[in-house]
């Protein structure tokens, strides 16, 4: 691993298992301890399998770990029968990328059983990279074969629930676009360098929620090194449609039509400027529905959006490189 990356003990995500709600109430909490150190030299591309880890339909999980901390399919007790091939292993590692004041905290989730050798950079919303729904979503993406890096875009100071509007606006003004852009570019270059050293894919995917979705557009527009092969923007905030003319890769936009932070007309404007882009709008859905659903309708839309996203990554990163 690159000398500028420092390995740290991986902090287990406290994930809320997203599935369709039933009359029984809120889904059970799921704790996953992903402690196995990640070694990029172990990344050997395998054929993509669409029968990935279906987290939406698992029920009544009881988790145990073996001596190495790895989760095994045989150690997951389910109320319903589940094919072992549907349950994938994911390992994780906490990182510090860069040096001194320019260092960036991040975590990397790696698919172990079905790794396809492709990297994805995931940019969080204002809640930060350690927000449980964000970790849960990153885990799901990794479970489908990808290697997912989630950086701390806020340098240890994400938005906190309960802040006043004035406090939020002051905090947001401190998140300088130049610094965030530099951190994103540093993480992208780090991933490319690691993948090249391992002799595998040289193209990355990039996913962004809300704040991260807005910066995803900026990152793709300035991507002169062509690090990214595609982007997926979930309800991006403060999108500048004019940036689309500088984007040379397909972009998938996912949003609800009841989202004040991501107007549908803005997405259709930028769609016209990006070749092979696509806009998917979910009727009645608000902000954040895909990674932090709050109703049965949100859950159903989130499941559908995840499937569309997964297929988009497959078609634009895996099919295009073969």
Task: Tell what function each PLM region has.
Residues 45-48, 62-199, 289-294:
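Serine-hydrolase catalytic machinery in alpha/beta-hydrolase-like enzymes
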Residues 1-55:
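N-terminal chloroplast transit peptides
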Residues 119-121, 205, 252:
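Conserved beta-strand elements of the Class I
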Residues 263-272:
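Short alpha-helix in the alpha/beta-hydrolase fold that links the catalytic acid
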Residues 276-322:
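C-terminal catalytic histidine-bearing segment of alpha/beta-hydrolase fold enzymes
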């Amino acid at each position: 691993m690159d000398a500028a990356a420092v390995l740290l003990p991986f902090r287990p995500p406290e994930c809320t298992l997203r599935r369709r709600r039933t009359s029984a109430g809120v889904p059970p909490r799921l704790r996953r301890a992903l402690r196995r150190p990640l070694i990029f030299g172990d990344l050997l591309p395998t054929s993509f399998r669409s029968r990935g880890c279906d987290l939406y339909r698992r029920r009544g999980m009881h988790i145990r770990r073996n001596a190495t901390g790895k989760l095994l399919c045989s150690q997951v007790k389910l109320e319903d029968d589940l094919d072992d091939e549907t349950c994938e292993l994911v390992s994780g590692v906490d990182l510090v990328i860069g040096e001194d004041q320019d260092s960036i905290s991040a975590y990397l989730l790696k698919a172990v059983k079905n790794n396809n050798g492709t990297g994805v950079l995931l940019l969080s919303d204002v809640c930060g990279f350690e927000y449980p729904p964000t970790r849960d979503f990153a885990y799901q993406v990794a479970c489908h074969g990808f290697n997912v890096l989630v950086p701390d875009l806020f340098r240890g100071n994400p938005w906190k629930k309960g802040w006043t509007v004035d406090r939020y606006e002051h905090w947001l003004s401190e998140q300088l676009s130049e610094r965030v852009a530099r951190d994103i570019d540093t993480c992208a270059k780090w991933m490319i360098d690691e993948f090249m050293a391992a002799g595998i894919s040289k193209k990355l995917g990039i996913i962004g929620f809300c704040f991260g979705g807005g910066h995803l557009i900026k990152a793709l527009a300035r991507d002169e090194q062509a690090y990214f092969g595609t982007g997926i923007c979930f309800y991006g905030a403060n999108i500048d449609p004019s940036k689309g003319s500088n984007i040379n890769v397909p972009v998938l936009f996912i949003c609800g039509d009841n989202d004040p932070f991501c107007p549908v007309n803005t997405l259709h404007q930028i769609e016209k400027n990006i070749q092979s882009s696509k806009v998917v709008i979910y009727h009645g859905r608000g902000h954040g529905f895909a990674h932090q659903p709050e109703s049965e309708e949100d859950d159903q839309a989130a499941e559908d959006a995840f499937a569309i996203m997964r297929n988009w990554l497959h078609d634009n990163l895996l099919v295009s490189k073969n």
